[in-house]
Amino acid sequence: MSTNSPLRSRASLAMLPLAGLLTVLGLILRGPLGNPSINPSGFAQSAASANFGTSWIIILLGSVARLYSFMILFGLLGLTRAGKLVFWAMLLSIVSEALFISLTGILVFTVPVAAQLYLQGDAHMLNVLMAGFFSGPVASVLYPAGLIGTLGSILFSIAIWRSNLPMWAGVLYGLTTPLLAFAPAFSYGLELLGGLLLLVSSTWLATAAWRQTIRETSSRTGQSSMISST
């Protein structure tokens, strides 16, 4: 791919670590994701706090950055021998992330209102939260979306392993989606680990791609100088 492509520009490559950074910041601010069926009062107090909405907005901004990062990875890897694999990795990852954004976006604006009503004495709101979001149609879509995203991240991992980018960065990247998608149900630590792996692997890949771009640019400049001097 041409080094002049916008996909290889500094700003575009910055989207890779930015997605990881926003995800980690959002998870730290949000804290453990409580279960309203186990501790309804604790969950309601957490969801009604200012941090809940703010943290989820940051997480969703990270997801938007991830959508763009999938296209960045396709631009970096699409012309390698794993080109077809990368296309499917990008497609599956975009579908998964788009489902996550559309569904959890509802939670950002609905759950805090329902939690405040519950704290004001409307116990029916707990049933609304459980039936509508945590065990209802939203959950029935989020988990398949997580499986789709996991497959996409694994395909990206394989493509990175076959490319000239750092192989182990690809391994770390392949672990991010399954941890972020499924760990929240049982372990905040593993969920946070998924965010940290996303930040580390994305930064590693962006740095390696940027250095490769500099080397290619220097090589082309040197060749041009040689041609002009002859």
What kind of feature is each model-predicted range?
Residues 2-230:
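Hydrophobic, aromatic-enriched alpha-helical segments typical of multi-pass transmembrane helices
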